């Protein structure tokens, strides 16, 4: 019977390629430090694709992103640290991320240079200034992505969304783009192995490099006009329901 895990050589090769990618990326992070938005977006896309390629991770876009202007608030379900690379590879933006990521190698610096807003999830006092900062970023025409679950899940369902940060889209009169992320193994079944909901980053990374094949599917589900929502709770509900429907679509074949 063949193993459902990658060989030790494959795991080692992936880790080596990731190390090389981290080293090269660390030397070229200035490419996403401010400057021309088009140049920054190209650099962010290249970083996202490079990280996934180093780990042999496939990326598929199901429902494509609709035509829309810049300055969009992007809301997605949160499964893994790979989410940021997958989304960056197909839809470059700034991110709202937990404070801890700021100290991560490369990813933290990449986030800082790309305009990521780092938040303390345990402090409600951060919400108002963060919404103000995100609103200003949206009004400048820059896209901002965030994970309204506020923490990672298994990826086979959704945790309840938080409404607070949707206020920035209402204040800016911006569109909100709903994105669903799903992870598949070598058999085409949904998998929770890339999730770091219950493990640390090193264990999660080892799980990922140990998989024979991993594919991330990105679906751009719908666009909501924040100005048409009664309040941030109604806006949150609309986005949450649309993402939940896609995430739950084939979760029954998960392994």
UniProtKB/Swiss-Prot annotation:
One Pfam family named in its UniProt record: Acyltransferase
Highest taxon of the lineage: Bacteria
Main location: membrane
EC assignment: 2.3.1.51
Molecular-function annotations in GO: 1-acylglycerol-3-phosphate O-acyltransferase activity
Keywords for this protein: Acyltransferase, Cell inner membrane, Cell membrane, Lipid biosynthesis, Lipid metabolism, Membrane, Phospholipid biosynthesis, Phospholipid metabolism, Transferase
Membrane topology category: Peripheral membrane protein
InterPro entries per record: AGP_acyltrans, Plipid/glycerol_acylTrfase
GO annotation, biological process: CDP-diacylglycerol biosynthetic process; phosphatidic acid biosynthetic process
Subcellular compartments: Cell inner membrane
Reaction(s) the record says it catalyses: a 1-acyl-sn-glycero-3-phosphate + an acyl-CoA = a 1,2-diacyl-sn-glycero-3-phosphate + CoA
CDD domains, A to Z: LPLAT_AGPAT-like (cd07989)
Role played: Converts lysophosphatidic acid (LPA) into phosphatidic acid by incorporating acyl moiety at the 2 position.
Family the UniProt entry places it in: Belongs to the 1-acyl-sn-glycerol-3-phosphate acyltransferase family.
Name this polypeptide is given: 1-acyl-sn-glycerol-3-phosphate acyltransferase
Organism from which the protein derives: Neisseria gonorrhoeae
